[in-house]
Amino acid sequence: MQDFNWKPIEPLSDKEREIDLAATNALYETWWDARKRLEESSSENLTAFIGRLVRRLSVETGILERLYDLDRGTTEALITRGFIEELVARTNTDIEPSRLIDILRDQESAIQLVMDCVAGNRDFTKGFMHDLHVMLTQHQNTTTAVDQHGNRREIALARGTFKEQPNNPRRPEGTIHEYCPPIHVESEIENLLNWLDDYKDEDPIVVATWFHHRFTQIHPYQDGNGRVARALTTLILMRANLLPLVIDRDMRAEYLDALESADLGELTPLATLFARLERAAILEALSVDADTDIDQAHKLTTAVIANLAAKFNRKREVHDTKLRKVNAVAKELRQQSRGDLEQSFSQLKDSLAVIYPSEVHIS
């Protein structure tokens, strides 16, 4: 295999614009409608779902970069309950649990910064990129450098500034992958951002894929470029009202192969991978919408039953009240009749006693 020589990035080509992502495109409007319903009827379910997706992204992006390893069970616990150190046993990861949680929280905070930009609270500029890089590498103090003789050594990591030295990795078979020389990074990033502004009417997944690849071609930072690239890809998708991009650890080889294909001029494998991941995220989100519909239907049914029960109870109360009134009147009449009868008997007894004093006994 030959060395890969750097060349300036290129705008989105006509060929790349025509990449067919129909299977995912068909879900866009369905998801946008569902999102609107969720925002109006069950915003807490939508927020919880996005939160889990962001935490999954935060875990997987570091695993892709070999910053740490983490077993699946602990991964799911952290995604469900949040980044809590007590959930991580020392045997479940290859670094100290406290350090793992620090890194995960950095990566989660970086995606929150992305969401601030999506909400319009930050502009998408070089300064924003630098802030994102600082946040993503907050607990990474060093990086591995290779000198001109091929010797590897740990050096201090420069955060929030573009690289000042080449960062061209040597592959296992000995070939060199050349990224953008430091002297051209500023102008290449400016081109990338300027072209991005022209693509607002293009398929957002194609644009996100193009941006992701061109950013990795530049490799503007000393280290952390993959994490920044994936965070910025999520930014582009979320600006189009789509969902964060989560590349799972099991897809690492496919992801890297797709990036190499893009280096050779074929963006389709990477776009297809991103579309597949976005489609899976949308379908999962639609299940949240369906669950919300079921929950709403259950709530409506419960409300109808409660309303009918209330009406029945009110009618029963009215009936019972009327019955109590009737019983009271009847009791009063009985008491009045008994009194009248007793008075009549008393009068009759007195009269008879006068006429037949010794023969009449009325008790």
Describe each model-derived feature in a short phrase.
Residues 1-223, 227-363:
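FIC/Doc superfamily catalytic core
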